[in-house]
Amino acid sequence: MEGRHAGSWMLGMLLGLVAASAGAQDYPNKPIRLIVPYPPGGGTDIVARILTEPLTSALGQPIIIDNKGGAAGNVGTDIAAKAPADGYNVLFTLSSHTINPKLYPKLPFDVEKDFVPISLSAMIPQILVVHPSVPANNVRELIALAKAQPGKLNYASVGTGSPGHIAGELFKLKTGVDIVHVPYKGGGPAVTDTIGGQVQMLFVSMPAAWQHVKSGRLRAIAVTSAKRSVAAPDVPTIMESGVPDFVVDSWYGALAPAKTPAAAVARLQAAFAQAQQNPQVREKLLLQGAEAADVTPSEFDRIIRDELAKWDFVIRAANIKPE
């Protein structure tokens, strides 16, 4: 009897392995949902949409963008963490992914344990822009204006804990200005209200604002990266404008639920790598102020872990609190 049970168990295991192998070879056989934890029109959404066509070509299945904004990206990220780990649910997010755990200690997901890295797709600076009515053309003039009117100027970000929020609080910390943070639920609404003059300043990813800078609806003051952006060589960095040790870089990347089959993860990683090498994709990203990243999934994993430690230090030093 035991022999028959053992034989049945072994047969079941072998059949399971064969089925898994066949499933891996068949993957993907239906559309893939790309969960973007921010509303349409923001930088994350823009970069995701640039990648959808080449990803569809590489995978042979449609890529369906599903915008799930709210709570500084935490709503959509939680949805992705709890989605079926079958290779058909992928989170496409930005570097707030490594900021939020240090700002919101009771999140319903764990960014290290609940996700596996697929691709760091693009690197991008935040850009500081102002409404054209603001009488400041550079960082020094903006600092002088803010100091002359303490508490009167406000700055928008895509949400509490976003890279733009971190950049704004660092700006306050390092320059001594008193400006008021106005968090939005995504880049689209934040940009719209800055263009409309409801807020005077905005720290946001370049894809969300750059076309409006070029059209004259917003004025670029500086970028937050260590060096000038290739897409905007005439826009100075905040550091070179006289604010020392000021660097806030952002990334956009894809992650899958942690238990996604290894074969599906590998296929997704290869598809994203192929898409990011596409000359048209690289050109489209550059036009938005972003640069396609050439980073392996293991390097992406290391970046996530390093940033968790970095932002923990910055958040404590700047005394940033949820709003």
Which residues are covered by each model-predicted region?
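Hinge/capping helix and adjacent helix->loop/strand transition within the periplasmic-binding protein
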Residues: 82-88, 102-189, 238, 251-284
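Bacterial N-terminal signal peptides
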Residues: 8-18
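A ligand-binding cleft/hinge motif common to bilobed small-molecule-binding domains
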Residues: 97-106, 170-174, 201-235
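N-terminal signal peptide c-region/cleavage motif recognized by signal peptidases
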Residues: 19-23
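An extracytoplasmic/periplasmic, membrane-proximal ligand-sensing/linker region
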Residues: 29-31, 174, 214, 237-240, ...
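N-terminal (or domain-start) structured segment
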Residues: 24-113, 152-154, 176-203, 294-295, ...
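N-terminal secretory signal peptides that target proteins for export/translocation
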Residues: 1-5
